[in-house]
Structure formats: structure tokens, C-alpha cells
Amino acid sequence: MPNNDILRPLAIPAKYVGSFLVFLYNGLYFVFVVNLWSRLFGKATKTEVPPLPKIRKLGKDMASRAPPRRGQSSEDNEDGLPAEIFNVRRHHKQAYAYIARALEVDEGQGSLETKKRAVEFYNRGIEEMEAGLLIPCIDEGEEWDKARRLQEKMEANLENTRERMDELVIIFFIIVVALLVSAGMMDDQPLLSARKTSSEPSQAWDVSKPTGPSYKQSKSYKNSTTVTTKRSQASPSFSSSSSSVNSTAGSSRTKPAKPAPMAAPRRYNPQVRRTKSTKPAMMAKQSCVDEQKKKISHLKGIDPKLANIIMDEILESGPAVHFSDIAGVDNAKKALQEIVILPSLRPELWRGDPTLVLFQVLPYPPGSSHITLPRASTATSFTSCFFSISKRSSLVHPVVASFFVKSLEDLASILTTSLFTIDEVDSLLTERREGEHEHSRRLKTEFLVSFDGVVADPEERILVMGATNRPQELDDAALRRMVKRIHIPLPDKETRKVLLTKLLAKHHNPLSGAEIDRLARMTEHYSGSDLTALARDAALGPIRDLNSDQLKSMAANEVRNITFQDFVNSLQIIRPSVGPETLKAYDDWNRLYGSNA
């Protein structure tokens, strides 16, 4: 019978199992990243580490007769120093030169090639510092103390350099994995969709014609471009259309049969369909995207790959949304008309205006149409291009963001009229505190400096708009730069009536005007998303009254219409998502800082 007291120390307590698994996962993830880095960008180099000196204690009589041994403990012929001290100083000097060169390259232009050069210099500096730390300095004396202090400095610099190397590894890992995964997702889509729509003419919808020295147009490539363009118009929630991705592929690849990789998978919204009325707006918006794609090839100081990643991930080119589709929020609509629409329609009236570059913050309760408003303003102004940045985007990663912000700013400077919307801006520009992580502080500083440095030509207006539902957590410096602060309140009674009427339009408005008015009074403190959820739940009321046999045999036109009682029953299920304390906090903030107080 084994003794349990002996086996008990080998068991891991239950409260430490989670920490142990997290530690194990982080270790495996780091090993994977290092292996991927070495396979993609590493070079097989062999560093010669100087051998350790052999130290022997000699007697006084033997030491007096022993000849000096060059390279170990004897004096060097050049400067009269022992070989160990001389080698420590030499490695420190070479490491300093490599690290200085790496910092110069790293802090320069943010292209992928320059980052690879910086990594090479960092590796050489690390090798020199590691070689210098292997040299033992055990004797006594002033020069030996200086050598030991040099080794302490090299040890601290080695740790900082390795941290920066880890950041660069993460940057390359994110970019490479995103490109590889996206390329794998895009391999079979054009071929499958081309078989379904092979009978449709491609000339009518071929709006993306990439240009470049390496582009060779072919019939199959043109058909695939046409098909993906139609798909992008049928899905309005996409952050970037597939046609813009394909036009990028023509300028960056010599094989036209393979499409360019997308930056990230897009969300599909099945509620909105492309109609004939939105077709001219879509073609105008698509022509704007194609025009900006052509300008990328003339960028100087920016890696075209990074510019394409930025435009593919955050450039919005989906179907147009107009102000008539949005109920209420008249103050926000008026402000956007003055800032975006009117300057684009009548630029001669705004020429030379010193307030061409404006920043806004839109405090909104959860469920408001905070992103639909700027998208509608760019749809009304056909010359505007809409950039949408959210906390889900890889561009706002704490490590990658500072690498992309300068390219994003330079990219916007060549576009005609650019509108940047930063969703959940409080997650990026929250108030700076003591003990904050260095990456987060660097990201905030980069954004704030970019805000100050955005200087647009009178013909090229740039507008940065931030949306948040926690405006009280914004940093004071960011709030100062956002000079117009527009509060989007919850829909009032009249707005709720319009929203309910629009939601019931597909069901031929089964409720009377008096019932809609009564329902609008009963849904006080409901947001737009709450009303949408309420209408969806009420639409299930007629189906809930049917049994399983009736559901299988009854025709769709035999199901009864939605009644007012269905909404009353759904009010017990769908409750308001915004509490009174939150609404009071928004009102207090708007009273102090809002532009429409």
C-alpha cells in the first residue's frame, strides 16, 4: 500500500490548475511564434562564441617562471588591458552600434522591409551582448569593476532588446497569419460563384480595373472580379468590398488567377437587399474606391502592402444608407450635414476655412445608430470615403497600432474627403493612469499626435469621428481634440412611432395608428435595438399559437397577422437595456461637455 503522504506533494492543488494551464498555453504559443518567425524570416547563421578562459592557480615559484599567455590573463599589446576586459569592451561597442542602427531603422518608415532590416540588426546586437556576457570578469581592480558594470548594462539592454524583438515577432505573426488564412478562405470562392453566374454579362458590372506593371488581364480573372463585386453589393455590412480586394491583387501579384487576400472575414446582414435605387449610389461609391486604389501605387514612404491591408480592412464601400432611413437624431444629422455633406457639395464656400479638420465624439446609449449616421453622411456625399475602425480590428492591437497609425494618416492625406469613424473610442483613448502598460500609452500617444498632425489640403478634407457609450472615461487630451461633442439620445415617442412603422412595413402594417401610438407610449426608454428585438419577438406570436402538425401542413399565407396583443406579450420578454442611472450619467455629461446641451 503506497504512502499517500509521499504522493501528495506531487499533486497540483485545484486552485492552481487554471494558472498552470494558462502558463502552459502561453509557453506553447511562444514556441510556435518563434518557430514560425525562424522559418519565415530567420537566416541560418552561426555565431562563434569565444571559449571560456582556463584559470589555474599557480604557486609563487611557478608563477614567476611561467611565460605570459596571450589572450587569457596577460596584458594586450594594443592598449595594455587584459584580454577579457578588451573583449568585453569590444562586444559592448559592437552591440551598441548594431542596436543604434536598428533603432534608427525601426523608428523610420513603417514598411515591412524596414522592420525586417531592423530585426537583423537587433539579432546581431543580441549576439554581441550574449558573447560579451559569457566572458568571466572575476579579478579585482578598477578596470575589472568597469568591465563588470559594462556587463550589467549589456544584460539590461539585452532584456529590452528581446522585448522589442518579441513585439516585432507578434507584428509579423499577425500580418502573415492574416494573409495566409485570408488567402486560404478566398481560394475557391471565385471559381464556385463563377459557375453559377457564367451566363451573366461581365462588362456591365466590371467597375474595378487594376493598373500596374505586373498586372496582366485575363478573361477568367475578369469574371471572378465581376462575381465578387456583385457579392459585395449584396452584403452591406462588409467593411470592405471584394472588388477592392481583387483590384489590389492585380497590382501586387503576377498570377491573375489567384485573388488577393482579405484582411478579415466580414459580417453579413441579410435584412438589407440591393435595390435599383441604390445601384447608382453603389456604382458611384465603388468608383471612388477604385480611384483611391489607383492612388496607392503612387504613395511614397508607405509600403503598398500595408496601405492595401488598411484599405481592405477598414474602408467601407457597401450599399448606401441615407438619412431618410434613420429616424430621429435631428441634431446629429444637422451637424453631419454642416461638416461632411455641404462642404463636399459646395466646396467653394468652405475653401480656406481653418476648421476643415474637425473631430467629434458621439456619446450614445447602447443600441443607437451611432455608426449608421456617418455611413449615411458619406452616402449622401459621393466624394467621401468612409473608414471604420473598431476595437475588433487588428489595426488597434497594442503592438500593431503604432506601426499602422502613420501609414493610415499618410493614406488619408491622399484621399479626397475621408471620414474616419472610431467605434468604442473609449477603449483606445481612455484616461491615462499611473501604472498603465507601455503599449497602451504608446497607442494613445500615437493617436493624439496624429490628430494634431493631420493637415489637409483645402480640396482634401479629413474628418475623424469617435463613437462611445462611456464618454466620461475619455482622456482629457482626446476630449479637447474632439471639438464637437454630439449626444445621441434614446428615441422619443415620435421617433419610436416611425421606427415601429418601418419595422412593420414588411408585414403590411397590421397595426392601426392608434395601436402604434399606444405602443410607442408603452416602449419608453427602449433603444433602437430594443425595438427591433421587440418586433422580432412579436412576429413569432402567430407561430407560437400553432402546434407542430399545423406548422408542417399550413401554408404561409394562412398564418394570421401580427396583432397588438403579440406586442403586449413580447413586452414581458424584451425589456429596456439602458437603466435610469446610465441615462442620468449621459444627461449630466451632455450638460457639461455636449455641443447640443
UniProtKB/Swiss-Prot annotation:
Gene3D superfamilies according to UniProt: 1.10.8.60, P-loop containing nucleotide triphosphate hydrolases, Phosphotransferase system, lactose/cellobiose-type IIA subunit
Subcellular location per the Swiss-Prot or TrEMBL entry: Membrane; Cytoplasm, Cytoskeleton, Microtubule organizing center, Centrosome; Cytoplasm, Cytoskeleton
Entry's EC annotation: 5.6.1.1
Annotated membrane topology: Peripheral membrane protein
Chain residue ranges for the region called Disordered: 56-80, 193-289
Domain MIT: start-end pairs: 91-168
Domain of life: Eukaryota
Catalysed conversion reaction: n ATP + n H2O + a microtubule = n ADP + n phosphate + (n+1) alpha/beta tubulin heterodimers
Family according to the record: Belongs to the AAA ATPase family. Spastin subfamily.
Summary of subunit composition and partner proteins: Homohexamer. The homohexamer is stabilized by ATP-binding. The homohexamer may adopt a ring conformation through which microtubules pass prior to being severed. Interacts with microtubules.
Protein name: Spastin
Species for this entry: Nematostella vectensis
Origin organism lineage: Eukaryota, Metazoa, Cnidaria, Anthozoa, Hexacorallia
